[in-house]
Amino acid sequence: MMGLRKMCRGSLMSKIIIGRYIPGDSLVYKMDPRGKLLITILFIWAIFLANNPITYAIITFFCFLAIIATGLKARVFWNGVKPLIGLIFFTSLLQLFFMTGGHVFWHWWIFSISSYGVENAIYIFIRFTLIILISTVMTVTTMPLEIADAMEWLLKPLKIFKVPVDEIALVISIALRFVPTLFDETLKIMNAQRSRGADFNDGGLIKRAKAIAPILVPLFIHSLETAIDLSTAMESRGYRGSAGRTKYRVLNWSKYDLISLAYFILLVGLLLIFRTH
C-alpha cells in the first residue's frame, strides 16, 4: 500500500503539461500561432497594468474566458500551475513578511505584516498564477513547430543586426518540446530506483536531496544521448541552418485573430479606465 502511494506521488510528474501540445478544435486552436504568441506576450504585459482589486478582477475574468475558449478541462490548467505553486507561495510570503507600509498588524525582529504587505502578497500570487495560466493556454494549443515559426516572425527585425533568428527560434521550440520528455524520463528513472528500494519522499530536506542526487547522472546522460540523436536525425535530413529554407505550412491571419485582438484591446481599455493612477 505504501509503495502504491509513493508511485501515485511520482505519477504527478507525468501530469505536468508544460510544453505539451493537446489536440483540439476550439477557437483558440484556429488562431494563427503568431497572433497567439503576440497576444500572450501583450497579455502578460497587461497583467502588470493591474494595480487594484477591480483591475485584477477584470484581468482574471478575461484570463478565464481564454481558458474556457480552449475547450479543455480545468484539470489541464491546474496541472500547469501545480508544479510552481510552492514557488508562488514562497514569493508571496516574502512580500507578506518583508514589505512595509500601511497599517502594521504584527512585527517581530525583521519580519512584519502590514496592510501593504498583505495586499502585495495577494497581488503577486494572482499575477504569477495568471502568467502561468495564460502561458499554458499558449503552449497546450500550439504545436512546437508553430511556436518556432511564431518566434521567428516576432524576432525577424533582429535580422538587421545579423542575429541568427531562425536558429534561436528552433532552439527555443526544441527546448519547449523536450521539457515533458525530461519529466517523463525522470519519472522512469525514479520508478526504476524505487523498485530497488530508493525512497524519495521520507526524511528532511537534506535526505531528500541526497536521494534525488543519483537521478541526475542518468538523466544528464539521457539528455546528451537525446541531443545527439536529434542532431544526427536533422543532419541526415539535410538540415544546414534555417537560412533559405521554405515553409511547408504557410501562416495566415484569420478572423479569429481579429477577434482575439479586439478582445485584448477591450481588456487594456478596461484596465486603463479602472486602474489607480
Swiss-Prot record:
GO terms for cellular component: plasma membrane. One of its GO terms (molecular function) is transmembrane transporter activity. CDD domains: EcfT. Keywords: Cell membrane, Membrane, Transmembrane, Transmembrane helix, Transport. It holds the Pfam family CbiQ. It is found in: Cell membrane. InterPro entries: ABC/ECF_trnsptr_transmembrane, EcfT. The chain crosses the membrane at residues 39-59, 61-81, 85-105, 121-141, 163-183, 254-274. Its main location: membrane. It is a multi-pass membrane protein. Transmembrane (T) component of an energy-coupling factor (ECF) ABC-transporter complex. Unlike classic ABC transporters this ECF transporter provides the energy necessary to transport a number of different substrates. PANTHER family: PROTEIN ABCI12, CHLOROPLASTIC. HAMAP family: EcfT. Forms a stable energy-coupling factor (ECF) transporter complex composed of 2 membrane-embedded substrate-binding proteins (S component), 2 ATP-binding proteins (A component) and 2 transmembrane proteins (T component). May be able to interact with more than 1 S component at a time. Belongs to the energy-coupling factor EcfT family. This is Energy-coupling factor transporter transmembrane protein EcfT. It comes from Lactobacillus helveticus (strain DPC 4571). The lineage of its organism: Bacteria, Bacillati, Bacillota, Bacilli, Lactobacillales.
